[in-house]
Amino acid sequence: MKRSWRSGLTLVLTATLLAACGGGGIAALSNSESKDSTQISSYPDARTEGAELLSAFYGLDDAIPFLASYRICGSLGNSDGMPVIFSEEVDIATLQAGDFSVLLNDGSEVKPGCVTPAPAADLGEIRTMLMIGDFGSIDNQPTTVEITGNIVSMDHGTNFLGAKVDVTPLEDGPALVHTEIVPEEDWELGKESSGLPFGGGTGCPASTQQVVRVVWAGGVTKPGGDEVDNVEREAYQVMALANDTLTTVTPFALGDLGDGDNNHELCLDVTSEVVRIEFPAGLMTDPREDLNIATSITLTN
């Protein structure tokens, strides 16, 4: 059965993305409110039990370019960038910059100047929120991110208030933090990249039998910034059960390319039960050119 709540919210998100493509620009996806303005009484089923942050990745220190900062946040200035990944997709109507608190190594506390789901704004990706602001420096790094406001999951069943996670240091490379089977109604087979830096990733080929989404702690490319290709595709190892035997499957294609985010779709030509994803060290880098670590993630859904 299709998830009716998600289908409705997907229509809202799609409308938001279309507005961003028009006059509103990418800034239409961002929020710079310094205080929590979510009326939590409107979400009576939202519970804090089980709410988690999967990662917070200190990816860039004073290195988001002037133009990008202006387009995203409406303000100029070289800024820090830190993606925060939630255990569930988020209803962005409940998202304010003031919902986040960042503790630095010296004990001081700061908040982001703005937050946005971009560039991870394709269908099924609204669990990664990019914080932009001043989060210390390489000598005084952020240590913890905590949700201090009411951020509600897309299904309105979870409130992330109080969730916290340790920050991955600036010098560390990206790792896998989440994987899931993509529901068939979300596959978008044959979709071409829009060429935009948000919401425009490619779909898997028409012959795909199963799609697995993997989420990295931060955006990943080849060293130097080029998009991944067959080298990285062949490096992905999918552990799957076939007739009670664990086998290794290589994706025959990759999807969700061309949009500069932290997600890849592994396009499989088998329907075996996926158990785990593995990826070796040293093939991809974050925007700071830190190489990825050897990493694996177990499927939980």
Where are these regions (language model features)?
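Non-catalytic beta-sheet/beta-sandwich ligand-binding modules that flank or precede catalytic cores
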Residues: 22-301
